[in-house]
UniProtKB/Swiss-Prot annotation:
The gene is der. Associates with the 50S ribosomal subunit. Keywords: GTP-binding, Nucleotide-binding, Repeat, Ribosome biogenesis. PROSITE patterns: G_ENGA (PS51712). Belongs to the TRAFAC class TrmE-Era-EngA-EngB-Septin-like GTPase superfamily. EngA (Der) GTPase family. GO terms for biological process: ribosome biogenesis. This is GTPase Der. Pfam families: KH_dom-like, MMR_HSR1. InterPro entries: G_ENGA (IPR031166), GTP-bd (IPR006073), GTPase_Der (IPR016484), KH_dom-like (IPR032859), KH_dom-like_a/b (IPR015946), P-loop_NTPase (IPR027417), Small_GTP-bd (IPR005225). GO terms for molecular function: GTP binding; ribosome binding. GTP 1 binds at residues 10-17, 57-61, 119-122. GTPase that plays an essential role in the late steps of ribosome biogenesis. PANTHER family: GTPASE DER (PTHR43834:SF6).
Length: 436
């Protein structure tokens, strides 16, 4: 089920990112200190009054080299295209500016809810100055101090009031997957080839989300799939649409709704920073992953080429050691028949549940191989572990002191669990918790 999207827009230096961090709070988390996992905070999940939503700081997407007004226009266009609710941030210290008026004229035409936030209202006396912002024609201004957290609750209330009705839960038996990657890596050709390979009638499912084109199909064994594609990857006519920074947001929307991600790399161009950035988002979201090297037919190859590629991918995507790699050609259909089976296998791994007794046998065996660490004379004690979730498989390890569970030992336990059970293509999460 797609989460509704909130876009934060506004000219530079009005405090968009501060408001973003204040709303997102601790939900922005970097779970691993691994090189290559993105530290970009333009996208997060927020929650208020039991409603979850996606939050986008459009300033983080912007092209800093573009002319000033072009940047602002770009932000507003993204907001118009993507958001269910737009949060327009202005500065109470500077008052209404020409740039604010420029953005307001664009937003006024969107026919989408716009919440006008006057930020940097850091003392009560400044509240008297917010009335000038009524001139923007966007309704009541909300005075806020993002730095001090004053007024953000009122903004969140307004966001929730303007969100669309919640969608019905999707069928959990249907495997949802998407192809993501840089523009021109061959996603569209792969999509068409996969659908053709299945020899089924594929039908677009309209209205599932505002901007997605979902294609539903069934394989010969009766497994149902939903392939999530975005309108932005297919439609034309917008100058910014094919820029990598715009496609980042499209990819993140697809990642959010998918169970399994097919990360497509162009064999002709190799691995780029964009690939690592998007893969990091999918990894942190706990999604299943297949690394698909497309256009494999275009390369001059010898007996070592595939191994060299695999080594390079493992080196540059160290945090994706669990993800299988497949070399394909959408043009010649090389190895495409393997993809649906790989997706099914990963979905099965994502939904695996390990009985507590079996899991704890593995944990005890791991401790026998590599005793728990000590810190300042105090040894980590592991009492027991249990699985608390699937998609991704998540385990809580109950210990005497959480601080004694070093990252390296947590990684060791994860590796031992992976050796004992089949978790192909899916991350697994381990959480240390003090036993009460």
């Amino acid at each position: 089920m797609a989460l509704p999207t909130i876009a934060i827009v506004g000219r530079p230096n009005v405090g968009k990112s501060t408001l973003f961090n204040r709303i997102a709070g601790e939900r922005i988390s970097i779970v691993e200190d691994v090189e290559g996992v993105t530290r970009d905070r333009i996208y997060a999940t927020g929650e208020w009054l039991n409603r979850k939503f996606s939050l986008i700081d459009t300033g983080g997407i912007d092209d800093v080299d573009a002319p000033f007004m072009e940047q602002i226009k770009h932000q507003a266009e993204i907001a118009m295209d993507e958001a269910d609710v737009i949060v327009f941030v202005v500065s109470g210290k500077e008052g209404v500016t020409d740039a604010d008026e420029y953005v307001s004229r664009i937003l006024y035409k969107t026919n989408k809810p716009v919440i006008l936030v006057v930020n940097k209202v850091d003392n009560p006396e400044m509240r008297n100055d917010i009335y000038d912002f009524y001139s923007l024609g966007l309704g009541d201004p909300y005075p806020v101090s993002s730095v001090h957290g004053i007024g953000t609750g009122d903004v969140l209330d307004a966001i929730i009031e303007n969100l669309p009705a919640q969608e019905a839960e999707e069928n959990p038996d249907i495997i949802k997957f998407s192809l993501i990657g840089r523009p021109n890596v061959g996603k569209s050709s792969l999509i068409n080839a996969i659908l053709g390979e299945e020899r089924v009638i594929a039908s677009p499912v309209a209205g599932t989300t505002r901007d997605a084109i979902d294609t539903h199909f069934t394989d010969p064994e009766g497994q149902e799939f939903t392939m999530i594609d975005t309108a932005g990857m297919r439609k034309s006519g917008k100058v910014y649409e094919n820029t990598e920074k715009y496609s980042v947001m499209r990819a993140m929307r697809a990642i959010e709704r998918s169970d399994v991600i097919l990360m497509v790399i162009n064999a002709e161009e190799g691995i780029r920073e964009y690939d690592k950035r998007i893969a990091g988002f999918a990894h942190e979201a706990g999604k299943g992953m297949i690394i698909v090297v497309n256009k494999w037919d275009t390369l001059e190859k010898d007996n070592h080429t595939m191994k060299q590629w695999e080594d390079d991918i493992r080196d540059q995507f160290q945090y994706l050691s669990y993800a299988p790699i497949i070399f394909v050609s959408a043009l010649t259909k090389q190895r495409l028949h393997k993809l649906p089976e790989m997706i099914k296998a990963i979905s099965e791994s994502q939904n695996t549940r390990i009985p507590s007794a079996v899991l704890n046998d593995v944990i005890m065996d791991a401790i026998a191989i590599n005793p728990t660490p000590t810190d300042k004379g105090k040894r980590l004690k592991i009492f027991y572990a249990t699985q608390v979730a699937t998609k991704p498989p998540t385990f809580v390890v109950f210990v005497n002191e959480e601080e004694l569970m070093h990252f390296s030992y947590m990684r060791f336990l994860e590796n031992q669990i992976r050796k004992a059970f089949v978790f192909e293509g899916t991350p697994i999460h381990l959480i240390a918790r003090k036993r009460k």
